[in-house]
């Protein structure tokens, strides 16, 4: 080979090597410019709008729960299971439902529409609440008193069609949702016999009322603030706010005469509601009552009403369910405890339960280490550790208070009459919880979820949540998926809301002044950090609304990263964990869906959840050799951490 040829050959080799290096750098740059996108883009690209990894798991869980319902229907052994079968048969008997029509509802609608003044209407509205469990004048929930631990009555904003606050009613992104509900109400009224013009006028009248009420109610962010919605007053104080309703008569008629102390969640909304409870607005109240009766019960009557309901679901959820599918969904809603018990027996193995228990305890131990080396002063650290060590762990909880199981379906009654009677039983039984410490599970086990309950200081890992585990022996993959989820929920014990409650789940200011000031500093930094992310171009993430969930995300990632460190994990282990974390939150949402989510969800959008957390994680930088040239890079002084 000549000297010139040798030089040319060497040059080609150099060019080739440089090209390989450049290609590697390019690929590596994509890898860390948007970690969420890099990990998930191949999965997402062929998915339909609205798809998510979690939805796929929930569909699998739902199918499993449906199969359990089928097994119960085919071979019921207990009285509760026989009720499930009776409900199913009645729901599918569309011939009898069509024949019965609205006979069981027309009586109530007629009585409401015959009232001639607001006092007569109030009398009928109270009867309506007693008979149909429809709350027109006051919405009530039974929850724990944050200071005593006993169940009390919370007076909450009255239910509206699509939200409680102006955040929903004034936002243009929700126009399609609002129009769908208006069309739904319009069709219900037309089917009942109103003319097109009458139905249009009534729909607009009700929408105008809700819009004004929402504009005079707490903002969405306020409804998430303990100080805003925990407002203990007595009945006499409520009487001074809601002057057009005889409060004593109202509570006495409902069998709640012993109630004195209660929590008024949104005083402003009831001040506004009071202005409407006059003779001048009698027609409005009649129309609200009519539409509420139809919304609540008409789907259990004729095929035409059922079709109106299923078409609304198709517009809102993107799927039109068959009658049989709807029956299974209703069974899961009405009998959550029965389905949960059977679901747990079939899908929660002892091995999985033990694995989750051990992992949860490992996470709790790591939180203790993090707390003991944190910015808290010694007094606050001691109380934080006490709270941590008193967290109750519930796996496959299945302790829903299933009041509906106490009602025996009567085959001689119509489906809608049975549902009316069942709702009365449920309402009466729920009132019996007042002034007790009875606890109920918020979610059935056939749900992909875990949650921290601040009033019982418990971490609740639903059986459906374990579906994310593919192999209990794959420690690092599980650490990034179910491990992160558990660590996230435990972190809620110390977020902006959870930190206000002690180890017994009672409202208590256990932070010293200096620790509280430092924590507020950290919260402000987290808010600013997440405000800097955009959901879509020119639409910023709301760091204030998402503060609690962002704190939980950051704390969870610190926790599982520390576990990796203590397990002497290698680079591949870190990559496995971080990739697993990113995959769980994969979704394919449209721009409008992302904006809508930001209005109603306290979590940051999933892409921000992944990239925001990892961009503040030092070990992530080391694992992927991220530097200032990469878009995932955040200057060290601008990164946020909760405990370190």
Feature roles, as predicted:
Residues 64, 68-363:
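Noncatalytic, helix-rich "gating/capping" subdomain that lines the substrate-entry/channel surface
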Residues 21-34:
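Membrane-interface motif at the C-terminal end of an N-terminal transmembrane signal
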Residues 48-71, 196-214, 478-485, 573, ...:
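Short secondary-structure subsegments characteristic of cysteine-rich extracellular domains
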Residues 36, 42-46:
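Primarily extracytoplasmic ectodomains and periplasmic/lumenal surface modules that are beta-strand-rich
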């Amino acid at each position: 080979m000549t000297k010139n040829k040798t030089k040319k050959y060497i040059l080609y080799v150099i060019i080739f090597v440089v090209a390989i290096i450049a290609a590697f750098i390019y690929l590596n740059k994509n890898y860390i410019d948007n970690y969420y996108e890099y990990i998930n883009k191949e999965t997402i690209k062929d998915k339909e709008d609205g798809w998510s990894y979690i939805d796929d798991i929930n569909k699998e869980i739902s199918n499993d729960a449906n199969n359990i319902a089928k097994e119960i229907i085919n071979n019921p052994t207990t009285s509760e299971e026989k009720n499930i079968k009776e409900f199913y048969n009645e729901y599918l008997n569309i011939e009898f439902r069509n024949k019965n029509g609205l006979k069981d509802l027309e009586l109530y609608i007629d009585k409401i529409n015959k009232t001639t003044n607001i006092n007569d209407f109030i009398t009928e509205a109270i009867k309506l609440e007693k008979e149909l469990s429809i709350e027109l004048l006051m919405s009530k929930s039974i929850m724990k008193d944050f200071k005593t631990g006993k169940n009390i009555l919370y007076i909450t904003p009255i239910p509206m069609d699509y939200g409680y606050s102006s955040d929903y009613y004034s936002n243009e992104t929700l126009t399609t949702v609002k129009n769908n509900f208006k069309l739904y109400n319009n069709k219900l009224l037309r089917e009942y016999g109103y003319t097109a013009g009458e139905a249009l006028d009534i729909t607009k009248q009700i929408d105008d009322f809700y819009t004004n009420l929402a504009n005079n109610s707490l903002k969405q962010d306020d409804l998430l603030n303990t100080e805003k919605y925990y407002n203990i007053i007595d009945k006499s104080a409520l009487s001074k706010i809601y002057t057009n309703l005889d409060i004593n008569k109202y509570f006495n008629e409902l069998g709640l005469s012993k109630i004195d102390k209660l929590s008024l969640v949104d005083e402003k909304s009831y001040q506004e509601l009071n202005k409407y409870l006059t003779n001048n607005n009698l027609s409005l109240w009649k129309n609200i009552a009519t539409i509420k009766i139809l919304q609540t019960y008409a789907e259990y009557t004729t095929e035409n009403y059922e079709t109106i309901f299923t078409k609304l679901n198709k517009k809102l959820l993107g799927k039109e369910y068959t009658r049989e599918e709807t029956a299974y969904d209703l069974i899961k809603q009405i009998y959550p405890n029965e389905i949960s018990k059977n679901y747990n027996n079939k899908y929660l193995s002892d091995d999985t339960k033990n694995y989750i228990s051990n992992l949860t305890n490992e996470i709790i131990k790591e939180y203790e280490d993090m707390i003991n080396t944190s910015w808290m002063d010694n007094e606050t650290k001691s109380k934080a550790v006490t709270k941590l060590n008193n967290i109750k762990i519930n796996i496959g909880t299945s302790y829903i208070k299933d009041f509906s199981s106490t009602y025996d379906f009567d085959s001689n009654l119509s489906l809608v009459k049975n549902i009316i009677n069942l709702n009365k039983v449920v309402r009466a039984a729920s009132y019996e919880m007042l002034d007790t410490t009875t606890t109920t599970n918020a979610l059935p086990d056939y749900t992909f979820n875990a949650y921290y309950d601040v009033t019982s200081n418990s971490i609740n890992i639903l059986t459906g949540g374990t579906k994310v585990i593919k192999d209990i022996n794959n420690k690092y993959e599980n650490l990034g998926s179910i491990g992160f989820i558990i660590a996230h929920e435990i972190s809620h014990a110390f977020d902006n809301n959870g930190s206000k409650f002690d180890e017994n789940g009672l409202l208590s200011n256990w932070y010293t002044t200096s620790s509280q000031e430092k924590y507020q500093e950290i919260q402000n930094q987290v808010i600013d950090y997440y405000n800097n992310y955009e959901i879509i171009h020119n639409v910023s993430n709301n760091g204030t609304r998402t503060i609690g969930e962002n704190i939980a995300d950051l704390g969870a990632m610190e926790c599982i990263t520390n576990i990796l460190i203590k397990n002497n994990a290698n680079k591949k282990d870190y990559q496995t964990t971080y990739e697993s974390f990113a995959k769980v939150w994969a979704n394919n949402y449209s721009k409008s869906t992302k904006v809508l989510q930001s209005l109603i969800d306290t979590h940051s959008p999933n892409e921000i959840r992944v990239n925001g957390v990892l961009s503040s994680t030092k070990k992530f930088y080391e694992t992927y050799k991220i530097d200032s040239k990469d878009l995932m890079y955040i200057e060290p002084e601008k990164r946020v951490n909760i405990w370190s």
